[in-house]
Each structure stands twice: as C-alpha cells, then as structure tokens.
Amino acid sequence: MATSTGVRVSPLRVAVASFIGTTVEFYDFLIYGTAAALVFPKLFFPQASPAAGILLSFATFGVGFIARPLGGIVFGHFGDRIGRKRMLVYSLVGMGVSTVLIGLLPSYAQIGLAAPVLLTVLRLCQGFAVGGEWGGATLMAVEHASADRRGFYGAFPQMGAPAGTASATLAFFLASQLPDAQFLAWGWRLPFLFSAVLIVIGLVIRLKLTESPEFSAVVQNSAVRRMPIVEAFRRHWRQIVLVAGAYLSQGVFAYICVAYLVSYATTAAGIDRTAALFAVFVAALVAVAAYPAFGAWSDAVGRKRLFLVGVVLMAASVFPVFALIDTGSALLFGVALVLVFGLAMAPAAGVTGALFSLAFDADVRYSGVSIGYTLSQVLGSAFAPTIAAALYAATQSSDSIAWYLVAVSAISVVAGTLLPSDRSAPEAAVVKG
C-alpha cells in the first residue's frame, strides 16, 4: 500500500481536478438523458411502438442509477484501503470510456439485438464508475485544504453539477442545429465523443496529484481498515442515513430543474424549447459562480448553519418558481430557474462537500460519504422527474409538485439538523457560539 511520494500540490489544483471529474459525471448524465428522449428509441428500440421505445430507452437510463450504490461501495472500500487518488483515476477512466463507447455504438439496424444489450451494459459500467466519483473527488478537495478553507475548496466538486449541465446543454444545442437526418445519423454522437476531451484534461491533472494528507496519515499510523465498508456501517450507520436524507432535497431539486422543468415548460406552459434550454444554461452558469462563494462564506459562519438556511430557501422558492413558469413567459422561466437552480440551491450545495465528508472518520470516510450520497440518488434523484410527471398528470396542477419539493426539503432539514458538525476550527467555535 503506497502513499504519494511526490511534492504536495496546491489545494486549488486538487480542487480543479475534482471539479473536472464531477463535471464529466453530470455532463454524461444529461447527454444520455437527452439522447434517451430524442434518439435512442429510434436507433436502439425501433421494433417497439413509439411509447414503448421511450419507456425502454429511459429504462436503460435508470439502470445507471441502480449501479451507482454498488460503485460507491466498491470505490469507497478501495479508496479507504489503497487511496483516494488511484480510485479517482479509475472512476474518471470508467466514466469516460463508457460514454465514448456509447457514442460509437452501432444501431439496432446494424447489429440487431446486440445494440440495446450493449447500450445497457455500457450504462451499467458508466453508473458503476459514477458511484465512486463524487465521494472521492470531494475527499481529495476537502482533505488537501487547510481547516479554514475546507468549505471553499469542498465546493469545487459541487460546481461540477451546474458546469456539467451547462456543457451538456450547449453540446446538444449545437448538435441539434444539424438537419434532422444528419442529427439522427451521426450528430447525436458528437456530445458523447466530446467527453473524451474532458477525460484527457482530467487525467492529465489527476495523475499529477499527490495522495490526500489525511489518508496518508491513516496509512502511516497503521490505521487502514481491512473492511472499511463494514467499519463504516458499524461506526457511522447513523451518519450514512443522515447524509442520504440531507442530500435528498438537492438531488431531487437538481433533477427536477434539469430533467423535468424543461419538459413542463414546453408542454404545460407553452414555452419555446430553445428558450427553455438557454434558461437552463444561464441558471447553471450562475450556480457555478455562486457555489464557491457560499462555500467560502461557510468557512466563516459555519457549514451546518448555511446548509440549513439553503434548504429552507429552496423550499420557500418552489411556489414562486412555478408561478413564474406558469405565466408562459420565456423570460420569467429564465428568472425562475436562476432563482431556484442558480441561487436558492447555492447555500446548501456550496457547503455539502465539506459538511458531509467531515461527518466521517478519515479511515472510513470514502465508504461512508459515497454510500450516503449514492443511496440518496437512488431513493430520490432517480425517480424525481417521474414522480413530478405523475403528480401533474393526476392533479393538473403544479402545486402538487411544489408540495412534493417542500416535503423532501423538510426531510433534508431534519437530517441536516441531526448530522454531526465538523469539529475542526472554525466550525466548532461557530457552532458552540
């Protein structure tokens, strides 16, 4: 078991490397979701009816979520045994290779039933690798930072969500400018193949990183656990459950904003799709700027306090947001998305990395935070757009969706309140008053 022997790199460089990985994670998610709606039913499930083709296509999308907790367990186990850096390289390669291969996959017309089977296998591999990305990226950023800058640097992996959203939205918008026949023939593949560029950049940076100082200390003190996953559940089962509950609102809100609201705006509110996508792009850019600002602020005022304020703001924003969207104005739809995705989510999202990771001991931290995070995604994020669509279909009112978002926010407030605070300075001093 080796620790890093290189010269220690700056916390900023580590944070940027973490940011690139989580950007790829959300970029891959969004381009797959978009392709699942627009392209995959025709290319991989042409024998099915249009409705069945869409269902089958989104079923392959859901398969990726099923694989995430398993990825979190495996990457967490080895991340707590052989190091964070090595597992982050593996997760980035796993995500990138799977995504690029999807972009190269022959269609049903070319290789028959093997096409949807291979699509499902690649989606499983992609989800497995994603399961280990966020936890490892967050730990590298937080554990390389000094105690008084953990909130700021811990926000960089969180920035990957809006950055990936903006990148994917732009990539598919540009590809969709092709004539329909060319887009269906080869244009849809371009966003998947572009993922290779992000992967190469990320690898160049990650391979030059040193191991996390806190993991190196665990190794030097001979405190590496034989079965970190077992130790995590034995000592920190409560924190795992609380992390899952605390993240629930962020995951649900994010997936509603980027996966459901565009569909809602274009169908129920009559807003032009191009304008709706542009609004997502702008809101995502606002979030990229806001997350590190709130992360830095949390280093002064306390992470848990800012997290709870953020979740309450998210809940408070939902009824005004839907009121703005229901006007049918593209401009007000943009204002609504900036309000919820760019600003209301920022206080909680900006501090999540440091708050969640530092709730666990260093020897089982990768396992604990990865399991809590991926569990929340399966229980909340994966089904959020479907639940929202079902609620609207049953009630024909956006109020039902708003109350759903308020309910998940309430769960996160309770879980966040019970989640142990980081006791390093200055958080402990702030919490104690």
Predicted features along the sequence, with ranges:
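C-terminal transmembrane helical hairpin of 12-TM major facilitator-type secondary transporters
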Residues: 305-351
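C-terminal ends and interior cores of transmembrane alpha-helices
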Residues: 93-111, 313-328
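Helix-loop-helix hairpin linking two adjacent transmembrane segments in secondary transporters
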Residues: 161-206
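Multi-pass alpha-helical transporter architecture, strongest
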Residues: 202-209, 407-433
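Helix-to-loop junctions at the C-terminal end of transmembrane segments
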Residues: 72-83, 291-303
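Cytoplasmic membrane-interface "Motif A"-like loop-to-helix N-cap segments
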Residues: 81-93, 300-311
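Glycine-rich segments within core transmembrane alpha-helices of 12-TM secondary carriers
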Residues: 152-173, 373-384
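Extracytoplasmic gate region of multi-pass secondary transporters
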Residues: 33, 237-286, 380-384
